[in-house]
């Protein structure tokens, strides 16, 4: 099996990249692809860049040229579930755009024209993530809806909009729905596994920039455990 792994920022992929053997690097269309092995599993690690367009471009190249069997989106996310704290893990059951609105044409809020309202994560990959979590002592995780938009959600107004329109949301970030939609169009199974870098409505002693390396470490550990179970 070949596993595609996608992170937006250098900080989100560095730990995984450093664990790769026989690593080959290709730069294309503003994206960086690292192909090799992690724990004897064939992987292609993509550093896509931030935001939905960058993620869609990178995922398209990944799926078309490298043809992984499955895709794991890793990195950081902002927590919306009240039980989440910094460093906790979120696992997607489904992914939606929170900044898409073509309701004037009869679509649901968050649904892009011609696309499903939600992109369902692969059941086997979700179960794999749960099994990986069992091997991570003292790591709290929540499984549910992750919402994506081309904005860092930091205002009370935007948080309220998301909560009102997507009441089951557990986390938000800036790439997953683009990755999910691209995987949907390529019929490639996906799951999103991210670590919480900040939490809505909770004061944190650490800023996003300060906590990002720790979130990257936590999400990378999840991916390592999943790759061990894939073999």
From Swiss-Prot:
Coiled coil: none annotated. The gene is mtnN. Transmembrane segments: none annotated. InterPro entries: MTA_SAH_Nsdase, Nucleoside_phosphorylase_d, Nucleoside_phosphorylase_sf. Belongs to the PNP/UDP phosphorylase family. MtnN subfamily. It is an enzyme of class 3 (hydrolase). GO terms for biological process: L-methionine salvage from methylthioadenosine; L-methionine salvage from S-adenosylmethionine; nucleoside catabolic process. The active site is at 12 (proton acceptor), 198 (proton donor). Its EC number is 3.2.2.9. SUPFAM superfamilies: Purine and uridine phosphorylases. This is 5'-methylthioadenosine/S-adenosylhomocysteine nucleosidase. One of its GO terms (cellular component) is cytosol. Catalyzes the irreversible cleavage of the glycosidic bond in both 5'-methylthioadenosine (MTA) and S-adenosylhomocysteine (SAH/AdoHcy) to adenine and the corresponding thioribose, 5'-methylthioribose and S-ribosylhomocysteine, respectively. Also cleaves 5'-deoxyadenosine, a toxic by-product of radical S-adenosylmethionine (SAM) enzymes, into 5-deoxyribose and adenine. It comes from Vibrio parahaemolyticus serotype O3:K6 (strain RIMD 2210633). GO terms for molecular function: adenosylhomocysteine nucleosidase activity; methylthioadenosine nucleosidase activity. Pfam families: PNP_UDP_1.
